Amino acid sequence: MTRRIRIAAISLALLCAAGAYWWSLQRLTFLPADTAVFVAQVAPPPAKDSPQMRAEIDELLAIQAARTEAQREAARADRKKDIRQFYGPLGVEAAAEESLDPLRTFMDRVEGDVGIYVRAAKHRFARPRPYVVEPRLKPCIGDVADNQSYPSGHSAYGYSVALVLADMVPERRTELLARADEFAHHRMTCGVHYASDIAAGRKAAEWLVVEFGKEAGYRAAESEAAGVLRAAIKLPPVPAK
């Protein structure tokens, strides 16, 4: 009887997990509720005992050894995913922030879709965090899943934001991508991601932004948000493509 109860409990847990995952797919705003194609094109991370894995751990140890308090605080400040962290490269003035609520709503929906797709890949690979593999690494932030290192969700978010905003404001593309580089690298500064996690997150963002562009609902919402943004930073409407 005990064995039957255990099997029933496990089955129920699996059903609940599957149900929760399916429910999350229903929350997608722009992308189709099918992450399989995305996950299939994500290359696997370096093997656990490979020279590349060792090199990436050594790189993180070197970053940790050289890390200053200012770098630590900057990395901690980038822990939250917030479109306002990219206002600097856009030249958004404080007085204009309130007018950008429609942009924030749009980007929150983009982030939601990106997050659902990237989490599907994280579950597929279940890569342990660097500090799990190398105890000498002391992360400067907590509250991250120990086995969801690859791809980096922060990297995917940062590059998705930069690429979407660069489509709206191509005049600031270089500055936006530089901010995304910094945003993503801060995850290595804190010791919670390998370099290959960051690279995979960027590739995921590039793939997803292309897919966003195929969806009519996304294109309409992006056009509206772009108008709001360009008006707020005193730029003329983006030329028609």
Labelled PLM ranges:
Residues 21-189, 221:
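Hydrophobic alpha-helical bundle signature of multipass membrane enzymes
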Residues 128-131, 158-160, 198-206, 226-229:
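Short alpha-helical linear motifs
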Residues 213-241:
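Acidic, carboxylate-rich catalytic segments that either coordinate divalent cations
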Residues 14-20:
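Hydrophobic h-region of N-terminal signal peptides that target proteins for export
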Residues 182-213:
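Interfacial helix-loop-helix junctions of multi-pass membrane proteins
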Residues 1-13:
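N-terminal Sec-pathway targeting helices
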